[in-house]
């Protein structure tokens, strides 16, 4: 999300980040049925792209998705991801999902240990201009409606022609992955995108 946030800061464009549950939640057997090298390569590529772009990156501690790495089986008990995704959708209701998800992503994927404890998430919400206590109260009181909105986001993602994240959709055309951001900018410039 760092590169998407930079894109929104640098260009005259608004990015409406629409949170979805990760593929591991939407299709728990996805990882088990893929080639064993798929996960290894995906993580290798994530580290490589982050290093190439100078983005701090480290393994999540803990991973928001509880999974047996050896078998690739997704655990039935998921103590982190539902709260995180609902918080992201609550931020989306306020027009701040990109900022919030970027700040939380820096914690989770930036190597912060125990990002889910103490004031880590509060600090992320503060930096995004949000109040974590307010978001958490909404997550508890309105979980069903938030999940319905997340489901709508997931349907829109699949309707765009892709299933993975990050996917940027412009004029109905999906651009999947960090390596497609420059191509998305190129496409938007063809339609009149200008720098701020």
Put a short name on every predicted segment.
Residues 1-13, 101-196:
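C-terminal cap of thioredoxin/glutaredoxin-like
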Residues 2-108:
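Structural alpha/beta surface segment adjacent to cysteine/selenocysteine redox centers
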């Amino acid at each position: 999300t760092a590169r998407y946030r930079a894109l929104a800061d640098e260009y005259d464009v608004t990015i409406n980040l629409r949170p979805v549950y990760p593929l591991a939640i939407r299709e728990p057997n996805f990882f088990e049925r893929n080639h064993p090298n798929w996960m290894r390569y995906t993580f290798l590529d994530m580290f490589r792209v982050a290093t190439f772009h100078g983005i701090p990156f480290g393994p999540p501690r803990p991973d928001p998705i509880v999974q047996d790495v050896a078998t690739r089986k997704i655990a039935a008990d998921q103590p982190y991801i539902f709260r995180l995704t609902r918080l992201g959708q609550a931020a989306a209701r306020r027009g701040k999902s990109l900022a919030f998800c970027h700040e939380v992503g820096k914690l989770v994927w930036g190597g912060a240990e125990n990002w889910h404890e103490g004031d880590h998430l509060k600090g992320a919400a503060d930096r995004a201009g949000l109040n974590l206590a307010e978001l958490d109260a909404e997550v508890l009181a309105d979980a069903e409606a938030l999940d319905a909105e997340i489901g709508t986001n997931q349907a829109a993602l699949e309707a765009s022609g892709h299933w993975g994240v990050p996917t940027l959709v412009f004029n109905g055309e999906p651009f999947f992955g960090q390596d497609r951001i420059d191509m998305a900018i190129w496409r938007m410039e063809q339609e009149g995108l200008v720098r701020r």
